[in-house]
Amino acid sequence: MEKIPYAILEKGSLLLASPDTDQGVFARSVILLCEHSLNGSFGLILNKTLGLELADDIFSFDKVTNNNIRFCMGGPLQANQMMLLHSCSEIPEQTLEICPSVYLGGDLSFLQEIAASDAGPMINLCFGYSGWQAGQLEREFLDGNWFLAPASYDYVFMDNPENLWSKILKDLGGKYASLSTVPENLFLN
């Protein structure tokens, strides 16, 4: 029996860019869909990390000892806006659960407290976001620009996010697994 592909476009879905997508930031992107409604959609790119360190002058931290904090480019829209994607369920009034054990939200005091601890929840500090107008994401999906997979804690906070796109395609199996080996630049093949 052939495995039926995941095809639910909703909060908690992962969007995987088709190998044909070569639109800059979206090339081989994995996006966690955080909101999807009749009014539009928004999500955060998980596998485009930024080589930043927490700057004391920006965040007013005395010290940063938590290695569970990762900087990500959430998307091309409002790149100066920061969103917290984390695994801490202890601040439910400020957060929205996106999928089991993955939350969106929080404030600077939460971030400061976590950054100063030796351990703690996983945090993706996402700068910017990816957004679609009403009906736009559905059209892109139907045009084959995106594949879908269910989100999970393990995918969202994977140790090597640069390998996330290939990992999920392999996990989906079948034709998707073979797509995971397509080189980024076909002209170099």
From Swiss-Prot:
Its GO CC terms are: cytosol
Q: Which domain of life is it from?
A: Bacteria
SUPFAM superfamilies the UniProt entry points to: VC0467-like (SSF143456)
Query: What Pfam families does its record include?
Result: DUF179
Q: Which residues form the signal peptide?
A: none
Which family does this protein fall into?
Belongs to the UPF0301 (AlgH) family.
What is the name attached to this protein's record?
A: UPF0301 protein CF0373
